[in-house]
């Protein structure tokens, strides 16, 4: 009995020391939390379809013409700037970024609906290009796992699975299951070099969830992209907090 208690004591001490050595956003239950000083998420969101539909009817859902990208113009510009650095908006949080010889895609979503089911929230504007029309991608950045940023259909059908994939902690499995070979998970403030680019995952004030049981079990973050004298911050759905002061 004494031996059992001693072993149990050692396990508790070891786990305590291990947690003390982990960053503050790592919680003992294996989940993550926002940086210190971030606003707290209070209460539970009360969802009502009747309220949602009632409030939706009050909104002007007309899409401004300037918000709809002309596909031919986008393709023309991609060809025109293929040997130059550029940032091209595809839709929502999806951008094509070219720096030197490296082409980056961010949070690509090419599906009609964002959600676990085919009838989830539907986008109002199609992406400027289809998956088949995007240029060769060398680097795939994913900020977090919400359905309007992490699109399973896009990940599964993505034509350039030899691209480097960089994701926050515990998101790599969503890529390796579809035979991506170069998948790297980063914690906040970790950096990785890809060709001539330096990619750093920075904190964000957000959260993660894809089901009823996985709240905050995967990390989220912003990406700092550095290339020569250029710096680009690609931010996920982040709130404001002490980290931005």
What is the meaning of each model-derived region?
Residues 102-104, 138-139, 164, 197, ...:
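Structural motif
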Residues 153, 207-245:
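Active-site-proximal loop/helix segments of hydrolase catalytic cores
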Residues 108-110, 145, 204-205, 236-238:
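Active-site metal-binding loops of divalent metal-dependent hydrolases
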Residues 4-13:
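Sec-dependent N-terminal signal peptides
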